[in-house]
Amino acid sequence: MATSRLEINFVRLLSRCESLASEKRAETEWRLEKYVGALEEMFVALKKSPSKPTPETLTDYNRKVDFLKGLLEAEKLPSPAEKSLANQFLAPGRTPTISSERTPASKTVHIQSKARCAGEMRKELMSSGVSNSALLENDLRHRKSLPVDERQSAAELDQILQHHHNLQEKLADDMLNLARNLKNNTLAAQNIIKQDNQTLTQSMRQADVNFEKLKTESERLEQHAKKSVNWFLWLMLIVVSFTFISMILFIRLFPRLR
């Protein structure tokens, strides 16, 4: 089947979107989002077209459109950690969009996006580490310059903070134990359900065996009943025949008196 004009335009726009997604864009860049919106509309029209491509091709097109939409949504997330997590769930296309591609462009975009998120997370961790060190050093200097009463208040505050920290650790341990207990209960429930299923399967098998035995016994009784009826009919036939012959002989042996 020849490629329709709508599919050709869709592939061109898809290739353009993948090219824009692979570039480093400013936060005010709006073209990719508009292009992806138009791409989604064209894909809906392509699915309804009489000369639509094969189901496998449509599935790959849909996968690439969903990947671009998910990529845009991931870039709007506030923190690098959230962006990285969202990127992990993205599924790029499996085939090249145009014939000149050796590797699918969406896979390349996915790798670049994950690398950018990792770099942003690294920068954030380094900056937070430097700022925390500076804050700690300033706090120590400030405490050394405080009077005795204020130092004592700071020590009490540290104790309160340590107490809250211990409570948080205890709460985390309790939640971990609760999760473990929940997991153990789930596994136990699964084992019970599995055993019940096995028992039910065995009961069904036993019921099938009993049904077959009952069927065999019913057939045997039916055959026995048929034999009994046949014997009774033969017996009646013999009795009737004997009676008839006896009457004939009696008439012949003792003729009627005149």
Curated annotation (Swiss-Prot):
GO terms for cellular component: endoplasmic reticulum; endoplasmic reticulum membrane; SNARE complex. Pfam families: Use1. It comes from the Eukaryota. CDD domains: SNARE_USE1. Residues 151-230 form a coiled coil. Residues 1-230 are cytoplasmic. InterPro entries: Vesicle_transport_protein_Use1 (IPR019150). GO terms for molecular function: SNAP receptor activity. PANTHER family: USE1-LIKE PROTEIN, VESICLE TRANSPORT PROTEIN USE1. SNARE that may be involved in targeting and fusion of Golgi-derived retrograde transport vesicles with the ER. This is Vesicle transport protein USE1. It comes from Danio rerio.
